[in-house]
Amino acid sequence: HTPVMDGLAAAGTTFENAYCNSPICAPSRASFMTGKLVSEIEVWDNGTPLGSDRPTWAHALNLAGYETTLCGKMHFIGPDQMHGFQRRLLSDVHGPGNERLVANWEHRDVSRAAMTREAFDESGPGDYVYQQYDDEVARRSVEYLGEPARGEQPWALVASFITPHNPLIVRQQYWDRYYPEHADQPGIPGHRETLHPHNQRMGDWFDY
């Protein structure tokens, strides 16, 4: 179902043994931009900004004579929404602040896991603003590639999409490819009891 992606992989370089640098969005993207571990740049969660004094690969490409352009989500927190990029074709879907996604450790009864559980309960076919946002990312990125200036100097474009993402809503044509005929996931009796106690507690959070 992914002929374009398959073609890009066949004609380019495929990293078959690569791993995400953080399970959380903003820290992962900050690590990607700086080439540093999350522990080095201290972007611990989705509410912590990346310091503007941190050099990114966009800065390095600028010095090498590239035009650097960002289109779409990069989850930059705070007033610096560029971090080295010279152009931005579309602002972030979240806006510059995301403090609501920071864990509140003082209130034990406040759980973000409930939000995640609800996303699965609400999953299904439909149209959501994130899909519309991604459509605009694609449109503006293609428009950028067609600009005459692309042949005048080296360039680097980051086209960054948000989906798949909670809420797990997908357009009908894609939903029908898998559900209900091709998504049989029966329960496994006794599976929870085989898990480490910490993982069992995580299961309790998702049932909150």
Regions found by a protein language model. Give the residues of each.
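Formylglycine-dependent sulfatase
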Residues: H1-Y208
